[in-house]
Amino acid sequence: MQPQVTPAARAHQGPPSLSRHAVDTARLAAPLAIAQLAQMAMGVTDTILLGSLGPDALAAGGLGANLFFVVVTLLQGVLTSVSVSVAHARGANADDRVPGIYWTGLMLSVLLAVPAFVLLSYAEPILLAFHEPATLAKNVGEYCAVLRWGTPGSLIGVGMMRAFLPAIGAARRLLWISIGGVFVNGFLNYGLIHGAYGLPREGFLGSAAATAITVWGIAIALVAVLHLRPRYRHFVVRARPRLPLMGELFGLGWPVAITYGVESTLFLATGMMVGLLGEAPLAAHQIALNVASVAFMVPLAIGQAANVRVGYWVGAGVPVAARHAGFVALALGVGFMMCSGLVLITVPRAIVGLYLHLDDPANAHTVALAASLLGVAAVFQIVDGMQTVGSGCLRGLKDTRIPMLAAAFGYWGVGFPTGYVLAFHFELGAKGLWWGLAAGLASVAALMTLRFHRISRRFIETGIAPGPDDTDAASAAPHGHV
């Protein structure tokens, strides 16, 4: 984050160099990427330890955990509005507005936990309505009945704090506490599942309890850091949550949640289509998707950093710097994914070998198919990185509703139909479905990038900052508005 000088002085000094933008964006994104990888590691830990109880426990616990993370991830999208609002305020040298955003965002997190809690409470009847086996539905319902108590902690610790901390220059605190959470989660999972370390033996429900306790621990630790460290205390001084501000945060954030949902359902539907092709294609799909998901954490973090940095310079009233911050972030995201894609093309079998025994003849078909999907993933990753960073840049401009529509069109108007036709009419199978994903992501990436180019250029030409649902410069809010 830049030194706190007046917006007028910043404008007079001129925008930072492109290399300065690159360094600042990388410094902000690096701890966010590691924190997100730590969150993935928690899920891997849960899966491994549930697997020690057998396939039934793994199936119930895995499905219950997936339901939990899908629900809270969608609602966390609403809280991304906190990040850009704080960034705008700090850019405008209006740190006195930050506590109001903090307390209002905290209250919004608690309110959002209510529908999540209710939905998870009805996991069993929901699964029965989808004709899942009664025993599985019952076990998943019991798992979610425990895990639902972690929804407020997850929305505060992962949702609210992941948005707030980078915007005040405290991303490293999120990093270290997230890494600590991995070890706490592993300790509690093993202890509560198997009754070790003097903890009660709860079986597969112990994993749900461990996750709920861990996310609450992370939330409490992050809140404590903000309130106890003198460096951050002025950002969280007591302020009354304001209903109009909560409405603004919700209005800015709900399209992001819908965008997350549109993308998630595309991948879910693609997985279901692959499942129709047989077990080997589905296994290959899961391997390729897992590899792509790990690499995706980096551009996702760069997109979050772009959200903050673009928003900061919009608040400061320096449109050239806001535009440069966005395009430098796009270059970083695409550049990383090109390097990652090169690895996938160069050593696909070695990567597949991390998941399957290459020498086992029974795995030959799956190995070959997974290696071919990694070739598609090399292209898929580049446009995936571009679209997620582009989305972050637009959030920095408080532009979320048009990107939501662009995502819906790209994913379901282009991606799914293309994949379906290639897979089942041109008989390309799983590879065709993956080319459909790539086509959908490419269309979204192009639309996001072009929109950022147009709005940021207009900001430079008019000097009027964009606002929510920006469609005309004359109707946008004055620069510096939060």
What are these regions (language model features)?
Residues 16-48, 52-53, 66-85, 109-117, ...:
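N-terminal transmembrane alpha-helices
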Residues 34, 38, 42, 71-75, ...:
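Residue-level hotspots within pore-lining transmembrane alpha-helices
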Residues 26-46, 146, 181, 214-218, ...:
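Transmembrane helical elements of multi-pass membrane transporters/channels
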Residues 58-117, 157-169, 173-174, 284-348, ...:
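Small-residue-rich hydrophobic transmembrane alpha-helices
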Residues 1-29, 86-153, 184, 191, ...:
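Short alpha-helical transmembrane segments in multi-pass integral membrane proteins
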Residues 37-59, 127-134, 191-202, 261-294, ...:
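Helix-terminus/linker motif at the lipid-water interface of multi-pass membrane proteins
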Residues 79, 83, 147-166, 174-182, ...:
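Short runs within selected transmembrane alpha-helices of multi-pass transporters and secretion channels
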Residues 50-69, 134-142, 204-209, 245-252, ...:
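Interfacial/gating helices of multi-pass transporter permease domains
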